[in-house]
Regions:
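Thiamine diphosphate
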Residues: 1-131
Length: 131
């Protein structure tokens, strides 16, 4: 995008965005034609909602539900969309790419939809939780 001027579409989950999200400052500072699509299911792999410690804390695989990642663009003068339907996604993606402005599309998806691609919760077996 920097040298070619071509639009870029980055597709990631809400967990991945947690690691790289502040790159939006650079994207906005250079006014790059980057559209970031965040599939937001409220968790790592989808979150399991199980608190193994018994302390009432959120599960380590749960993220803040209903997070509005699109609102981050207000701070950096980019464009943000929050979408919940395929029609809204189609519109936001088309508009974001065509505008050539830094854009985040927060795509709220059902946490139970699809299949888990990994088993991070297996890293914390129940027999050692809370020890």
């Amino acid at each position: 995008s920097v040298t070619s001027g071509s639009p870029v579409v980055a597709i990631e989950g809400d967990s991945a965005f947690g690691f790289s999200g502040m790159e939006i400052e650079t994207i906005c500072r250079y006014n790059l034609p980057v559209t970031i699509v965040i599939f937001n299911n409220g968790g790592i792999y989808r979150g399991d909602g199980v608190d193994l410690s018994g302390a009432g804390a959120p599960s380590p695989t749960d993220l803040l539900h209903h997070a509005r990642y699109d609102k981050l663009m207000d701070a950096f003068r980019g464009v943000g969309y929050n979408v919940t339907t395929t029609d809204e996604l189609r519109h936001a993606l088309t508009t974001g790419i065509q505008s050539r402005k830094p854009t985040i599309i927060n795509v709220v998806i059902d946490p139970a939809a699809g299949t888990e691609s990994g088993h991070i919760t297996k890293l914390n077996p129940k027999q050692v939780a809370g020890n």
